[in-house]
Amino acid sequence: MKKIFFTVCSSLLLTLASCGVEKVYYASDFGVVPGTGEDMTQEVALAIETIKAECDGKPAVLVLESGEYDFYPDSANVREYYVSNHDQDNPKLVAVALEGVRNLTVKGAGEGYANFMMNGRMLPIAMVGCENCKLENIAVDTRVPQITQVEVLENDVENGYITYRIAPYANYRIENGYLVVYGSNWNFVPGWGIAFEGDTKRIIYTTSDIGLGTSGVQEVEPYVIRAPWRDHRLVPGSVIAMRSYARPTPGIFVTECKNTTLLNSCVFYAEGMGLLAQMSENLTLDGFNVALRGDDGRYFTTQADATHFSGCKGKIVSVNGLYEGMMDDAINVHGTYLRVVDRLDDNTLVGRYMHGQAYGFYWGGEGDSVQFVRSDVMEITEGNRVVEIAPYDKDQLAGCKEFKIKFEKPLPADIANGKYGIENLEWTPEVYFAGNTIRNNRARGALFSTPKSTLVENNLFDHTSGTAILLCGDCNGWFETGACRDVVIRNNRFVNALTSMFQFTNGIISIYPEIPDLASQTKYFHGGDGKGVVIENNVFETFDAPIVYAKSIDGLVFRGNKVVQNNDFAPFHWNKYRFLLDKVVNVTIEDNDFSTGFDEQKDVMYRY
């Protein structure tokens, strides 16, 4: 796969244009040295504060030798952060806090990464209100992950018992017959898991999320457990990532920043997203990986998405990355709908964050262009502009769930009937996702929900287990905006997606807005204005039928693609059509190569 050079050139030009000669600082001069096992939290904080004071925003580089740097909760930077799509438990224990920093590069030097190792539940890196900052050759990991890996040694299917070996990094104890895993400041009983093939590290066919044998257990010998657990799919040698659904912190948190770059850096493990960026402008990922270390035997990386962008604007560039083994998607780009809960006067309403993992952070400001959507039919009704906005249920932004918003134009009389959401169009990004490999992960590959131009090209989607690419939009459950107007998916290779079922996984490419009352919808959610979604010159290697599922879109092109049928797995998906189209118009399917032939009468189904 060709390497994408776009971002390196762009970053270089940005650096030359905005920066003078960089002043270089060496972390070792502040006592920050690798491989000691000692806590480096305060030493790193001193280095950052010194650079801020001495450089006052002028260009600087903080250089760390390659190797492992340990951080501990007891001396962490204690912060109140509200992180989109994460558990809103505070305070956060932060290892490295970059706050209000300008024109700083934190760089690992030498062979390998400068690897920040967490010793307990912590937020490894926070970038808050920064501008023109870069992480280069930096990695994030933890000594004892909250995901506990086990290997199946014996599966007594007849009697309903499985014997498994717990990975040596894990801490565990048995309490009242329950397997309790723990770290220095956390403990729980794993309830769900993801099963991997021992030899390929791919998720086992048709397993999705599995229940676990963590109750009524017996210790056969240290780290070997026998449990009542009936699942014939888990043959000896299978590897299970035992987990919860908790998302306390991402690996890297970026909020209200501008011109942020992650270059040749990696998240090996995080108890939430690998990278979570919210309400930030212009983000570049080049050679950023969420990947296995390869030297410790782990099959998993992050507890949730590899990268996640909530309410960002400008341009998101993600190229030359490797995303593998995560418990959710490689990338998700969206905004956040507020629900209208009260109409105070003709121009003023109350909008509320609705999801329990998305509130407490900046949503928009004066002058922002917005549009309203009816959540039951997902129809955009009209636009408006913000005149004033302030927290309504709290005195401050942090932790607030409601905003009082005054608009330029009068509001409809029925705006507060519980059916309307508000989308902020100012905070919507253009996206370029290219030259990446996504493999062996749970759920889906890539999610995009933005009205701006989105180009997805030259990527490899390899055994993503669910849908490879999802275009969504949901003002009912996740409350993630919005409609896609201009998406091009080209020159990608898709290998055996859809080996398991997850939410929204109706095709290898699934265009799936959440619309409770599709039958009553009179407008189309995605597409329009002569654009829509173009899928061209891709290769689909698949064992099953569904290629594209689409719902409520005006403008869908599937052109010049190659579909190669294989027998790697038995077909199982409920969707037996190549193209299943619900309320879709202006469709073009042409000049494609299907290895088993194409019959439009049998392979295409229009509904509604």
Where are the model-predicted features located?
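Solenoid scaffold repeats with emphasis on beta-solenoid/beta-helix
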Residues: Y25, A60-L62, V96, L104, ...
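Bacterial Sec-dependent signal peptides at the C-terminal "C-region" and cleavage site
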Residues: L16-V24
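Ser/Thr/Gly-rich low-complexity blocks that favor extended beta-strand/coil architectures
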Residues: T142-R143, A167-V217, Y359-L397
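Short glycine/acidic-rich loop motifs that flank beta-strands on beta-rich extracellular proteins
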Residues: M118-P124, V144-T148, T249-G251, E271-L276, ...
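Extracellular beta-strand-rich solenoid/capping regions of secreted or surface-exposed proteins
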Residues: A45, E49-E54, D70-T105, M117-E136, ...
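Acidic Gly/Asp/Thr-rich repetitive segments characteristic of extracellular carbohydrate-active
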Residues: A27-V63
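Small/polar beta-strand repeat architecture
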Residues: I203-R247, A390-V431, R439
